[in-house]
């Protein structure tokens, strides 16, 4: 069997995103144990479903604490939840590919979080997230 560079790169990217999900889960658990609020810093692209009025210089910071969001779900490709912003009474569905998350930390200790490099969203994931329904391939981790 011949392994191409592309196959190795795909496998590495899959592991990298999986590691990101594990780190995000760990930070959320740490924050819950210490009564902190977990935040993510997102480098927004067209696959991100976020309120654009809060995006500054291509970035948005989101509170992912259980008290701030409803229905938090995460798989190896993206996370999603519902949240309200500003004075809005209706909640908005937020969807963020994991490859666009550049930092995760407790709001109270932002410099002690974990940082990542943003990578381009794959065409397949972009199509999945911008289509009419968002359906993950793997079982969701629900907190």
Where are each of the predicted segments found?
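Eukaryotic intrinsically disordered, low-complexity regulatory linkers and tails enriched in Ser/Thr/Pro
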Residues: 1-143
């Amino acid at each position: 069997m011949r392994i191409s560079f592309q196959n190795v790169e795909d496998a590495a990217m899959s592991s990298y995103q999986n590691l990101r999900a594990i780190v995000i889960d760990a930070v959320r658990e740490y924050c819950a144990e210490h009564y902190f609020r977990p935040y993510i810093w997102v480098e927004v692209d067209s696959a991100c479903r976020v309120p654009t009025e809060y995006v500054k210089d291509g970035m948005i910071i989101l509170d992912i604490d259980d008290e701030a969001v409803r229905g938090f779900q995460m798989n190896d490709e993206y996370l999603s939840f519902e949240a309200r912003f500003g004075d809005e009474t209706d909640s908005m569905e937020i969807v963020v590919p994991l490859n666009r998350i550049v930092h995760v930390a407790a709001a109270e200790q932002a410099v002690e979080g974990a940082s990542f490099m943003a990578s381009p969203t794959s065409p397949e994931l972009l199509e999945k997230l911008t289509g009419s329904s968002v359906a993950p391939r793997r079982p969701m981790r629900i907190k």
